[in-house]
Amino acid sequence: MEFLPVAPDHDVLDCRLPSRQTAPVVVASPHSGSVYPAAFLAQAAVSLAALRRAEDAFVDELFATAPALGMPFLAARFPRSYVDANRESYELDPGMFEGPLPRPLNHRTTRVAAGLGMIPRVAASGEAIYRGRVPSAEIEQRLETCWRPYHTALSMLIEQTHRMFGSALLVDAHSMPSSASGMGLRERDHRVDIVLGDNHGESCAADLVDCAERWLSARGLRVQRNQPYAGGFSTQRYGSPGLGRHALQIEINRALYMDEARHEKLPTASVVERLMAGLLEEIGDQARTMLLPRPLAAE
């Protein structure tokens, strides 16, 4: 299938709302975007195919039933290699940029050290994305046109959900390369199908994570928690169980649903789509009962 990048100045988000929200759940996909600005491609020292390897390809399609299940759904249309919405706003490598920086950058993180800040320095292959330094003015430009609209919309959906139900759960949907699915395992020939990330117990009620793990395991999927992915910026920012705000990151092994080399869906993608629909339905049912608002203390 021919892939044609486009460069719109708007419409950077895909936001789909249910006709009526019936579950305290918001589903988001920050890394499935595939709209590549032409100016970005002109800056790139690597091929479009190399850039696309960073995408959580087709994840927005795997979770597309969310609105039909009464859950808002948000996906970034901009690509992760251009702006990573699962990073802090100024989590950046200052050495990438030319010109005065807008403010001090948070550059002392393991993600920045790996070249994977809000504006990534390297592609999935480890190759440098850019031919030279990036004009520092692009930091604010990309924040204003991509990062801020995404998090403004996501924050609004979560806050509306919390006001409606007294609690809210963010399901942060991702995929992982099959090469990463054995990381952290003692037996290297065993691969993980799903990684559930709750920031090591800090971002989501344990009962909900237990429920998701049981449901997936009962269907023959190999599930692991927090290894190698415990959750990124969104999980940490939006997961505060003590405040009735929960966040659970779900990583799906790409080999389950796509040919990673050809960047194409496999026939099994429809099976994974049905599984994710079933998981969302189960999570929604459980969230309605598990995430009841706490009664106010007597005065």
Question: What name fits each language-model region?
Answer:
Residues 1-170, 175-248, 252-299:
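N-terminal catalytic or cofactor-binding beta/alpha core of small enzyme domains
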